Each structure stands twice: as structure tokens, then as C-alpha cells.
């Protein structure tokens, strides 16, 4: 079986919340795609409940695109500690951390239920499993902890 980078990462050494560059892949025509680890909570110490994580996912889909060009996808980790962010080009971890911070600030302080996209049977495959209350509480906690642009040392942006 192929080795997967995220399973090679020593999850006991990282210091969440952080943004980590996993890899930059170069396509046949020279296009670059960057893969980031947006770790919101400390692995094996906490996990965001699915309803809150699901709502954060739906909100980050738009809010990160409002703050950064070239976003391809932002998908949650199965362990519920964060997200993969895939983007064209080579944005820095600092740029991504600033965009993430701004998005979480909007979730925590501004977002209302009617702002959450994809919350009905037509636009979401599990539309009943959302919680804006949980999303706001987790966003506040992550912001209070501070988002670092480095995974192994705290360099809060």
C-alpha cells in the first residue's frame, strides 16, 4: 500500500491550531497545487462534533474563497480535528492562516443561520447534521487558542 504523508506525521509533536504545508505537487504543464493541513484542535485530545464541523465546512467553502484566490477544495479530516485545503499555486502558510483566522472570526462574530449555505435536502447530503451554535463555539475556542503558521512551534498570526 502506498504511504500517505498524513499517516507518517507524528501527531504527538504538533501544536494545534496551526496551518501546515503538506506538499506542493507539479502537474505535467507546470501548474502547482498546494495541500495544507488546517489543524483546528489538538489531535488525540479533542475532536469537533460532526454537526459543528459540518457547518464549519460549509462556511469555510465560501469564506476562504472570499479571502484567497485559487482554492480548489476544503474538506474535513475523518478524525474531526481539522481540514485539508487544496489550492492552486503556492500560497504561504501565513497567507492561509490569515484567511482562516478571518473566516473563523466571521463565523464566531457575524454569521447567522441564514448565512450557512447548503442546509436543505436539495443542497446537502446530510442536511440535518448541522449546528451553527457548535460552529460558533469552536470558532471562538480556536481563535482564543491562536492560529499558528507553524505546526511544531507556536507562531501565532
UniProtKB/Swiss-Prot annotation:
UniProt EC number: 4.4.1.21
GO terms (BP aspect): quorum sensing
Keyword line: Autoinducer synthesis, Iron, Lyase, Metal-binding, Quorum sensing
Comment on bound cofactor: Binds 1 Fe cation per subunit.
InterPro entries, sorted: LuxS_sf, Metalloenz_LuxS/M16, S-ribosylhomocysteinase
Transmembrane segments: none
Binding annotation for Fe cation: 54, 58, 124
Record-level Gene Ontology MF annotations: iron ion binding; S-ribosylhomocysteine lyase activity
Pfam families cross-referenced by the UniProt entry: LuxS
Catalytic activity reported: S-(5-deoxy-D-ribos-5-yl)-L-homocysteine = (S)-4,5-dihydroxypentane-2,3-dione + L-homocysteine
Cofactor names: Fe cation
Gene3D superfamilies with a match to the protein in the record: S-ribosylhomocysteinase (LuxS)
NCBIfam families per UniProt: PRK02260.2-4, PRK02260.3-1
Assigned protein family: Belongs to the LuxS family.
Subunit structure: Homodimer.
Role summary: Involved in the synthesis of autoinducer 2 (AI-2) which is secreted by bacteria and is used to communicate both the cell density and the metabolic potential of the environment. The regulation of gene expression in response to changes in cell density is called quorum sensing. Catalyzes the transformation of S-ribosylhomocysteine (RHC) to homocysteine (HC) and 4,5-dihydroxy-2,3-pentadione (DPD).
Protein name in the entry: S-ribosylhomocysteine lyase
Species in which this protein is naturally found: Pediococcus pentosaceus (strain ATCC 25745 / CCUG 21536 / LMG 10740 / 183-1w)
Higher taxonomy: Bacteria, Bacillati, Bacillota, Bacilli, Lactobacillales
Amino acid at each position: 500500500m502506498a504511504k500517505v504523508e498524513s499517516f507518517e506525521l507524528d501527531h504527538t509533536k504538533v501544536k494545534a491550531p496551526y496551518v501546515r504545508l503538506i506538499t506542493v505537487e507539479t502537474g505535467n504543464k507546470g501548474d502547482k497545487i498546494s495541500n495544507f493541513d488546517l489543524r483546528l484542535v489538538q489531535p488525540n485530545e479533542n475532536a469537533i462534533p460532526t454537526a459543528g464541523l459540518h457547518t464549519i465546512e460549509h462556511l469555510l467553502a465560501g469564506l476562504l474563497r472570499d479571502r484567497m484566490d485559487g482554492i480548489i477544495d476544503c474538506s474535513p479530516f475523518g478524525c474531526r480535528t481539522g481540514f485539508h485545503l487544496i489550492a492552486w499555486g503556492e500560497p504561504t502558510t501565513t497567507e492561509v492562516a490569515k484567511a482562516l483566522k478571518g473566516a473563523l472570526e466571521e463565523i464566531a462574530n457575524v454569521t447567522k443561520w441564514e448565512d450557512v449555505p447548503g442546509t436543505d435536502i436539495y443542497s446537502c447530503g446530510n442536511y440535518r447534521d448541522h449546528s451553527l451554535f457548535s460552529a460558533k463555539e469552536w470558532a471562538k475556542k480556536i481563535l482564543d487558542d491562536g492560529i499558528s503558521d507553524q505546526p511544531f512551534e507556536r507562531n501565532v498570526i
